[in-house]
Amino acid sequence: MLTLFTHINSFVWGPPLLALLVGTGIYLSFRLGFVQLRQLSRAFKLIFREDNGQGDISSYAALATALAATVGTGNIVGVATAIKSGGPGALFWMWVAAFFGMATKYAEGLLAIKYRTKDTNGEISGGPMYYIVNGMGQKWKPLAVFFSAAGILVAILGIGTFTQVNAIASSLEHTFKISTRFTSLILAVIVLFIIFGGIKSISKVSEKIVPFMAISYILATLIIIAVNYNKIPHTFQLIFSGAFSGTAAIGGFSGAIVKEAIQKGIARGVFSNESGLGSAPIAAAAAKTKEPVEQGLISMTGTFIDTIVICTLTGIAILVTGKWLEFDLQGAPLTQASFNTVFGSLGSFALTFCLVLFAFTTILGWSYYGERCFEYLFGTKFINAYRIIFVIMVGLGGFLQLDLIWVIADIVNGLMALPNLIALLVLSPIIVKETQKYFSETKNITKP
């Protein structure tokens, strides 16, 4: 079974999709005048601006919800997995994916606001399925349907449930000897109570947990790096040389390792920051704003925080401790071992705490993404049926094989990204026009 899905994954995440993902980001970066560089400071200032339009939640709450879904096991387990199989060079390719992915995330956020609608319950609905149909026309509806179907699969079979629950359950079992099955069932009960409150309930939890968990984890990794400060130059040498010549803990010949570094780096980068996946604009659409460009700018900060900051710190912490070279360590235990070199036995507790928070908030965020995709296909009448299915899948998350879970997650991620990337390319003239109009009106010095 694992071998079959691994072959499917290699096909889905082959050169065409990787080229489309990075290529879309590169294309948008040039068309938008590298908005991710020129407007990053403005973007961070906008996060806490006063709400000025219709919507269900504040722009900050929308970003917190998106980050809740984005900052998850990919930042801890995914980075460790990428480095283990692709070597230190995988981290470089994660940076590449993130840099160009910021332009992609900007475009997604902009389109989410421009083409959002209200559902029959009076709540805001938006995301790729809406900007595909409302922006590209009804003839493109099959693409919107395909995206929504893939989004449901990602939510209930990939990022939203299995990978997160399995990471929480495995970590708690490793640290506290708690049964994975017991953990899965408890998580299912907690999630049940929260997701039935909808986006407002999810965003309230996210607003409180996300800043705390991110700051706690960043401080912990900075301490590890500071203790091993003398190894930082060599670590960066490994990252840059490994990106083009290949160095992996698992061995193999150079060409294959470089290919693995590129594939794992970009795939894990997308898994982590979700740029191009089409998930974040679903949350962005609910923001109380009337300006698409401003929400686009806010959205792209999510990729910066997730990958350029958190994933980078995870990767460097693993590399400076040298634990990535130990053959029997992979996934969460590899990151855990790196923490233990500085914090001793407390390292396991600290990482477990962070991992549980990261994964739990991702479950909440993805429950909403899947719900909106489900609503697009089946209407609001059957939303509770989706929520029950989602909770059941959470309960099953601790029963599956880790390797198989990650492979399935990668496959459905790729299927979800494809229709969204097509939409971004087709709608790129509108993205550019909206961007030029906004910066012209605000008298920005440099127009894209």
What annotation goes with each model-predicted range?
Residues 9-42, 84-122, 143, 306-313, ...:
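Extracellular loop-to-transmembrane helix junctions
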Residues 54-85, 111-135, 146-149, 153, ...:
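Alpha-helical membrane segments and immediately flanking helix-loop junctions
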Residues 24, 28-29, 100-122, 129, ...:
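Helix-loop-helix module between adjacent transmembrane segments
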Residues 17, 32-36, 74-79, 155-168, ...:
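Transmembrane helix-loop junctions in multi-pass membrane proteins
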Residues 20-27, 31-44, 165-172, 179-187, ...:
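Membrane-interface loop-to-helix entry segments
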Residues 34-58, 81-83, 87-91, 95, ...:
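Flexible loop linkers connecting adjacent transmembrane helices
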Residues 1-73, 83-90, 101, 395, ...:
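N-terminal alpha-helical transmembrane segments of multi-pass membrane transport
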Residues 29, 108-116, 120, 222-238, ...:
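Extracellular/periplasmic helix-exit of transmembrane alpha-helices
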